[in-house]
């Protein structure tokens, strides 16, 4: 029997960083989200010993390394770059592991809102860690941490656990 191409594994409603009302779905798939609706990309660096490298954002705490896709980049390029900037890791054997699908049913596009509306995506990838450079804390991130247990108490967002598990299954 074939595995479903796309699996919605978690749903949240009225997430604070999006125009409300909204729905955010965590989708596990090896397909890419539509590029024209994807403005951010993330990378889960997976170590040979089964750990994953997680960024430590100064304001938000533990998170998967990622950020905005620049005009001259693909989502994969941006995820690779962000992983290096936020964790000091370089990766290879990169594979897509899923995306956040964010849908807003707000009455209109809020003033200054810079993302596709009413539907947008955040793309997630996983890759095998090739190298970890020494990391110097900066105004965005502190030194990254290696997580071995996706139930680690320091993980406060369900999406980290879900994409972390998907990364481990895809890369190891």
Q: PLM features: residue spans?
A:
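A short coil-to-beta-strand element that immediately follows conserved catalytic motifs
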Residues: 90-100
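A structural signal for short, well-ordered beta-strand segments
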Residues: 43, 96, 125-127
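Acidic, metal-coordinating catalytic segment for phosphate/diphosphate chemistry
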Residues: 1-42
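Active-site-adjacent beta-strand/loop module that shapes the phosphate/pyrophosphate-binding cleft
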Residues: 100-133
